[in-house]
């Protein structure tokens, strides 16, 4: 039974499982499953094979249960396989190593036969796990629907001794082992397989928040919450520390399922449940020993705020790679216009900026005698025309509007709007590319919405430089400036989605994407800034910058899959618009961030800065970006000469 109802959330994190610690021999598995389901758990993490089994010639695999004891849907929906923990593919003992390989392959084959969705692999037993990864990589190449979840403890622990005999090399005594490093080594050896995921063991102590944050960019499918991580409240019930609660909420928001594991450490009477937990009130006679822990997890889930309306609208776009618009080369479709026009926040900001500009342009004494000439370049279907006229009405200023639009289909709608609203005497429609049109008079105010996710990536500088000839020497441009920003991120899902194309071109393309399963590794830094009117209209719009990002020391090492890009625009004076995380305009959805991927992810050791170079290049027919990392290790220069991705003029 799901943990509860949270408006807008349909993710897998609503389901909670329980780990079966003892091998369910014979026909016990159906009873164990039935008991768990009746106690409101949704699935089992269960061993598939007797832990005492060692392969011998001619022996039959001692499985937990015949495939007939559960129906196909039960196996698929309610069982996650647990691979035997004695398996050690990097052991010095050759027989143990060979037995481990045979058994692992047999267990995975049995799980595939049962049509399980996932199996949990035991954690690496030492930091060097190359043979373990090699065997798993072989297995992954033969899988289709089965995912393998590598179990990793969520901790920074003392270094493991290679021989497990308690003796430690003195040279390593001062170091700590970051379990993220085990995962990173393993997934690199397995070539970033999209079917290799993580199951995190959540213990009683947690690393720093920055260190934890790395995992939100990784393919974490389950958080295995140990019962010894729970505290006891005043009523004797299990509860979690504030830090554990925050982590759990983060998991829920990232579609991570919780699995409760361990023995019950709380002697709670079977009669009561936590207040507000109406979904978990089954007959106490059959309740599971770990039900009090489930009740608490459900309580945490149910008290989360509903997903905001904007998040619900955007949920299907999460981590979905889209090509940026080419507004100069292509004419937008009606559906695209409609989506943008629903963003009332954006047009409210434009109206505020235009109103301030009108008041500055025309004093109260000149209101009755002065008419302001305003040009909307790239008028689309008219939302900026409407915002301009509303600003004029609000401020009591007279306005003459030129609406310039190159898309003949949008011009048809624009004519209908002007006629419907009775604006024929106020608005002149120009069906032309702004770069070709010769204006009959100069404008006091030039208004445009040519901004892309990276500010200048939809060629606003080129368009406005061409339209600047319409503007009076003391005229006002809205926007007056815009700046792009980037930050390094971990984004395993985006990397794997791009890798699936199996070519370089897709790794040299910038994508618009609603970022979700990512880890932000360092604060954003500014990249390029453009001002309008351009004080040097004949100057090139080419740009180059070099940035150095310092990752907080407590984060530890990390893997950079690329750079997230944003913009912030000054519309006029103190009215701004943007998506840069620190200053983002609330409740605006016209722009998702842009993502610049790296062909090969860059490993960044702890305390090591990242140095990145960005170029904005201009040619006769196109504009493109190039980017490269030079520290801590050099990457190729991506998209050299615009060979893979460009914006056409």
Curated annotation (Swiss-Prot):
Its EC number is 2.1.1.320. Residues 479-649 are annotated as: Beta barrel. GO terms for biological process: methylation; regulation of DNA-templated transcription. Keywords: Cytoplasm, Methyltransferase, S-adenosyl-L-methionine, Transferase. Residues 491-507 are annotated as: Dimerization. One of its GO terms (cellular component) is cytosol. Its main location: cytoplasm. Gene3D superfamilies: Divalent-metal-dependent TIM barrel enzymes, Hnrnp arginine n-methyltransferase1, Vaccinia Virus protein VP39. A protein binds at residues 340, 449, 458. It holds the Pfam family PRMT5_TIM. Methylates arginine residues in proteins such as histone H4. PANTHER family: PROTEIN ARGININE N-METHYLTRANSFERASE 5. This is Protein arginine N-methyltransferase 5. It comes from Oryza sativa subsp. indica (Rice). The lineage of its organism: Eukaryota, Viridiplantae, Streptophyta, Embryophyta, Tracheophyta. The gene is PRMT5.
